[in-house]
A protein has these predicted regions:
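Short beta-alpha connecting loops at secondary-structure transitions
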Residues: 15, 118-119, 174-182, 197-206
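Active-site cofactor/substrate anionic-group-binding motifs, chiefly glycine-
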Residues: 13-23
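A short, small-residue-rich loop immediately preceding and capping a beta-strand
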Residues: 19-20, 145-151, 168-177
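Flexible glycine/proline-rich, aromatic-decorated loop/lid segments
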Residues: 40-41, 157-173, 180-198
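Structural motif
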Residues: 21, 87-89, 117, 150-152, ...
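A mid-to-C-terminal "edge-of-domain" accessory segment
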Residues: 196, 200-235
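Alpha/beta enzyme core
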Residues: 4-13, 26-147, 163-170
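Short glycine/serine/threonine-rich phosphate/pyrophosphate-binding segments
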Residues: 2, 28, 154-160
Length: 235
């Protein structure tokens, strides 16, 4: 399962940061920390839903209680690692003022990266970019953390939303080879890499060896038994 995968990846590669994903639950964080025991560079990625829909129907909770749980999870993860990422699940449908409160609280608790997921793939690019910009302008201490994009492709907007996030201040993007992911998939690594390479005016260097994109795409497709559509962009 995921636990053994993280262990084996940690043993096999030493240069990248290896990140283990958890819910904002102490026992989950304990397991994530154990899975990272062989990693040279460790990160725990914990989080909780922040939209009113998630708060009411998934957690039967309140906005204030969600902030408390978020802060507690980050502080608990910091017992194990210095590098802690927090995700605000369904941030795409979370009201901006409340989202800013959550982000500010988890940064104060020690989060080094804050992930702003468009969990349902609902946002338009202008809307998602404006959300990132709002956080950049309204969160005290935003300079102490990196904002990350995490976009789903349910409406075919994942790559556009990710680029919009970058243009408005995000400095980490969560992407997948060939855009693989649940439902309609996640943001395509190869699309973002080539957009940033071709549009020099954005002035962001990913340090990706783009000559390796095509063979990597084919390898992932073969290993996962997921054919790439013939007219897929880039690959």
């Amino acid at each position: 399962g995921d636990f053994n995968s993280v262990i084996e990846i940690s043993k096999a590669v030493t240069w990248p940061t290896i990140c283990a994903l958890t819910r904002a639950v102490q026992k989950d964080i304990d397991v994530a920390a154990d899975a990272l025991k062989f990693a040279k560079h460790k990160r725990i990625h914990t989080g909780i839903g922040t939209s009113d829909s998630h708060i009411k129907y998934k957690f039967n909770s309140t906005r204030e209680e969600i902030i408390e749980r978020a802060v507690a999870a980050v502080k608990y993860a910091k017992r194990y690692v210095e590098d802690v990422e927090f995700y605000a699940e369904d941030a795409g449908r979370t009201e901006n003022e409340y989202l800013a409160r959550v982000v500010e609280a988890v940064i104060k608790a020690g989060a080094t990266v804050v992930n702003i997921p468009d969990t349902t793939g609902y946002c338009l690019p202008e809307e998602y970019g404006a959300k990132i910009r709002y956080l950049m302008e309204h969160v005290d201490g935003i300079d102490k953390a990196i904002l990350s994009t995490h976009c789903h492709n349910d409406l075919g907007m994942a790559t556009a939303n990710t680029i919009s996030g970058v243009l408005n201040g995000a400095r980490q993007v969560e992407v997948t080879m060939n855009g693989i992911g649940e439902r309609a998939g996640n943001t395509s690594l190869e699309e973002v890499a080539m957009i940033l390479r071709c549009h020099k005016d954005i002035d962001i260097d990913t340090n990706i060896n783009t000559q390796k994109i095509y063979p990597t795409s084919r390898m992932v497709s073969s290993l996962m038994n997921m054919p790439v559509q013939p007219n897929k962009a880039i690959v």
